[in-house]
Amino acid sequence: MTMLNDPSKKYRAFPTIDLPDRTWPSKTIDAAPIWCSSDLRDGNQSLIEPMDSVKKLRFWKTLVSVGVKEIEASFPAASQTDFDFVRTLIEDGHIPDDTTIQVLTQAREDLIARTFESLRGAKKAIVHLYNATCPSFRRIVFNQDKAGVKEIAVNAAKLFVKYAAQQPETQWTFEYSPETFSATELEFAKEVCDAVIEVWNPTPENKVILNLPATVEVATPNIYADQIEWFGRHITRRDSVLISLHTHNDRGTGVAATELGLMAGADRVEGCLFGNGERTGNVDLVTVALNLYTQGINPELDFSDIDGVRKVVEECNQIPVHPRHPYVGDLVHTAFSGSHQDAIRKGFTQQKEGELWEVPYLPIDPADIGRSYEAVIRVNSQSGKGGIAYLLEQEYGISLPRRMQIEFSQVVQGETDRLGLEMTAEQIHALLRREYLQANTPYALISHRLQEENGNSAVDAEVHVDGETQHWRGKGKGALEALVAGLPVAVEIMDYNEHAIGSGTTAKAAAYIELRVNGDRAVHGVGIDENITTASFRALFSALNRSLSQAQAKAA
């Protein structure tokens, strides 16, 4: 079978919502929602190999450590393993006072009874009821009409009240999901939810949670936002209801749907860390939270060690995080492109402590989430001078002058083209040493003596030339001018720069020279030494030898 030329014969567009006075497009998100992690339930049930109790407890502790206050721990009636995990959390004191355990149940009395039994002794708990409400599920899965689906929800809601009353020591919160909400007729979804509300009788002080899932993502995010705004306008006792979002990523827009849903008035978000979950996954709580953070809003979740969180999630889920995953992927703070690297390098140079973050191409400061700057710039055949210069400066304290950056980038480009691979900072530094610092033929500086008198300098340089030692002597107004005067070839110094590498007794000097030999094209040299004069002399010999070697190669 192949794709259809006319897909309308098999698929139909989801209808739009009649909401001409919608207000959500002009709203902004100005505070964090209530967060609920479903990693241990929705996420766990989607794994090829579900977590054992050890992994579950490790994951639970990670969720608590980052600040998630509502955690859906399991489906206690589904298995003894899930039931026992809830008991472990309660009996072994793993639930902090500011954290609420949440569990899920279907609408059957035996399952509801078992679910409440699992929570015995909990200080507070959210019990989450669901049944599917959309036309296809009513017709295909349950063979029920609207009245039958509504009756299932109402009867189960009554059982919640019954079993909660038997454990008055627990502070109960009830949650109801019209599963497949986003594919359900809005009027009917409201009708069922209103009926559940009537049974549970919430108040502004003891609210119920109405969770409105995009169980399968079937439309664009704006339609989901319209559904949420319409629902918030029409649901009974809105002041006694928390509207919760539970989006999936079937169309790749789970985060967008969640953000627009919050703009449309939702109070709460259910999802999983890094977007684990059935099929294409639940909404990624980390992305939504850090999107808020980069808009200047405290997400009330702490991802200061995002790589530590990622390690736990990967090991427990046995699924790697994609290298391009927002905020946490290996490559999301990395630039290979030359123009990007140049912009980032300039941004870092100009970024001042305490000022608004404005580094190009980096929407978040990697340091805020515990990541180093080492991987921000990496060098391959697409890279330019900016990235190379940045790595040398950050890793080795070597600040190449601008024109030398251009020259050396061509050297690096030739090497990356030859290798066909990325080059590390260590490899780039080794290439710099080979190309410049070890350029010692035909002339190798062995030692020098410098005399200063009346503002003039006299140099006696001991040089190794073709197996013999020579002395080159010259005078000038400075050490470099004196050395140039003693050279056997005509040299014109065009530019000179120097700086310290490090500080204190271990500091070294770096010198950079741009010169012409016998009127030929300009070349650069580098010298590094504890003594600044020696460093400058080594830089001159580096450039001199490179120029002569290039001229010889050209002549050949």
Curated annotation (Swiss-Prot):
Pathway: Amino-acid biosynthesis; L-leucine biosynthesis; L-leucine from 3-methyl-2-oxobutanoate: step 1/4. Homodimer. It catalyses: 3-methyl-2-oxobutanoate + acetyl-CoA + H2O = (2S)-2-isopropylmalate + CoA + H(+). Its cofactor is Mg(2+). It is an enzyme of class 2 (transferase). Residues 33-307 form the Pyruvate carboxyltransferase domain. Catalyzes the condensation of the acetyl group of acetyl-CoA with 3-methyl-2-oxobutanoate (2-ketoisovalerate) to form 3-carboxy-3-hydroxy-4-methylpentanoate (2-isopropylmalate). GO terms for biological process: L-leucine biosynthetic process. Residues 439-556 are annotated as: Regulatory domain. This is 2-isopropylmalate synthase. Keywords: Amino-acid biosynthesis, Branched-chain amino acid biosynthesis, Cytoplasm, Leucine biosynthesis, Magnesium, Metal-binding, Transferase. Belongs to the alpha-IPM synthase/homocitrate synthase family. LeuA type 2 subfamily. GO terms for cellular component: cytoplasm. Its EC number is 2.3.3.13. InterPro entries: 2-isopropylmalate_synth_dimer, AIPM/Hcit_synth_CS, Aldolase_TIM, IPM_Synthase, LeuA-like_post-cat, LeuA_allosteric_dom_sf, LeuA_N_DRE-TIM, PYR_CT. It comes from the Bacteria.
